């Protein structure tokens, strides 16, 4: 009888240790940064997004609502450039232009993970990696050839996350960003074909392809039955 009780206690102790070792701490926030490359589509480049690649750096902050849903604030700094000599389309009077610019962007985006993202806790069917889709709104400020402009942007795209460790995340994200302005490439290239631009018509686009590293913090309420 005593041996049976001792065996049960030993099994319970081992099970408790196993659960403690495999349990996943749940965190609310994720912060980090990344580097990558940029592309541009507009009056100085109408076809190949990567014909004049630039560079970008970014900082990110996520609120992780659940293993599937997150809100992300991103701050980007990057360079863009273009040259009409590379284009097959000819501008009026065979004019040639080139530009380079530095932009600053602040965006707020929604993320949806295709899998329950996380580690441990098999009953929640958590996966160590997940692809995701994302979209939102932003504001971009830039300086091109002495001209400083600003415009709203609509960033959207896809990405993938991988948990290197319990709280450390590696990510790769591609975003296309529609700028509600035709002056991202400067005033000289605004409406070169005399087709007047509107708020959403005949405006410039740019992209970012960014490799990110981030760290989770701020544990959720361990005794609550809901996500705070």
Language-model segments: residues:
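Bacterial Sec-dependent N-terminal signal peptides
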Residues: 1-27
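Short glycine/proline- and aromatic-enriched beta-strand/turn motifs that initiate or cap beta-hairpins
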Residues: 23-62, 208-220
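Outer-membrane beta-barrel strand-turn architecture
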Residues: 25, 63-67, 114-116, 162-166, ...
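Residues that define the transmembrane beta-barrel architecture of outer-membrane proteins
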Residues: 27, 51-55, 102-106, 129, ...
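Residues on the lipid-exposed face of transmembrane beta-strands in outer-membrane beta-barrel proteins
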Residues: 33-37, 59-63, 108-112, 135-139, ...
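Outer-membrane beta-barrel translocator domains and adjoining extracellular loop/strand segments
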Residues: 43-48, 84-90, 121-124, 145-150, ...
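Gram-negative (and chloroplast) outer-membrane scaffold detector with strong preference
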Residues: 67-145, 210, 217
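Predominantly the C-terminal beta-signal and adjacent terminal strand-loop region
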Residues: 165-228
């Amino acid at each position: 009888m005593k041996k049976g009780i001792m065996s049960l206690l030993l099994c319970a102790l081992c099970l408790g240790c196993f659960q403690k070792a495999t349990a996943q701490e749940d965190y609310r926030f994720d912060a980090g940064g990344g580097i990558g490359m940029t592309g541009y589509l507009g009056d100085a480049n109408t076809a190949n997004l990567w014909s004049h690649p630039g560079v970008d750096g970014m900082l990110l902050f996520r609120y992780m609502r659940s293993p599937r849903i997150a809100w992300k604030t991103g701050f980007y700094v990057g360079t863009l450039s273009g040259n009409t000599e590379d284009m097959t389309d000819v501008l009026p009077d065979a004019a040639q232009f080139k530009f380079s610019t530095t932009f600053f962007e602040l965006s707020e985006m929604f993320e949806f993970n295709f899998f329950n993202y996380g580690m441990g806790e098999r009953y929640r069917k958590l996966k160590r990696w997940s692809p995701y889709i994302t979209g939102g709104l932003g504001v971009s400020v830039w300086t091109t050839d002495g001209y400083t402009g600003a415009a709203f942007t609509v960033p959207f795209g896809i990405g993938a996350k991988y948990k290197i460790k319990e709280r450390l995340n590696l990510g790769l994200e591609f975003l296309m960003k529609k700028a509600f302005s035709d002056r991202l490439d400067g005033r000289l290239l605004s409406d070169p074909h005399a087709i007047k631009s509107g708020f959403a018509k005949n405006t410039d686009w740019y992209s970012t392809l960014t490799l990110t590293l981030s760290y989770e913090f701020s544990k959720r309420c361990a005794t609550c039955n809901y996500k705070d």
